[in-house]
């Protein structure tokens, strides 16, 4: 994914917003790096959030609609979408690497396989436990329910 913005530019933008008193809300998309980048995406995202320390953080899970440019990468095999278990693995890696005390965390969008809610860092253990239980039981939202 080429976002057209560097990590440093994200951090500077967050600092400028904070300087004006605007609350910072950030959205991350799980699965954006595909299977090859799962660990790197999770850890780099956690590092960015640790640096930015947003007021709010939302986690979505990648959904590709017909016609999406990334769909060609999936069809050609250059990118493999994450399985539900891998999405939870990525979220687990993120939560074990992030340090953003007080950030309101939500992963309750229709695209997500499970819903999580809490405040970082206080509620990370409970969210990790919910992820582990969901993985053990294969308790994921049905694909057909992941659409709005």
What kind of feature is each model-predicted range?
Residues 28-31, 61:
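Short glycine/proline-centered loop/turn elements that form peptide/ligand docking sites
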Residues 1-21, 31-52, 72-85:
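Conserved non-cysteine loop/helix-boundary elements of the Radical SAM core domain that shape
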Residues 47-148:
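Auxiliary Fe-S-binding modules of radical SAM enzymes
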């Amino acid at each position: 994914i080429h976002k057209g913005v560097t990590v440093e530019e994200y951090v500077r933008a967050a600092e400028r917003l904070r300087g004006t008193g605007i609350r910072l809300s950030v959205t991350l998309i799980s699965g954006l790096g595909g299977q090859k980048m799962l660990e790197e995406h999770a850890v780099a995202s956690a590092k960015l959030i640790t640096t930015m320390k947003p007021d709010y953080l939302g986690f979505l899970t990648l959904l590709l609609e017909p016609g999406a440019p990334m769909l060609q990468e999936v069809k050609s095999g250059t990118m493999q979408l994450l399985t539900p278990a891998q999405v939870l693995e990525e979220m687990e890696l993120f939560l074990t690497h992030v340090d953003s005390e007080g950030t309101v965390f939500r992963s309750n969008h229709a695209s997500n396989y499970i819903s999580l809610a809490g405040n970082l860092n206080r509620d990370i253990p409970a969210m990790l436990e919910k992820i582990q239980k969901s993985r053990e039981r294969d308790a994921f939202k049905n694909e057909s329910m992941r659409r709005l």
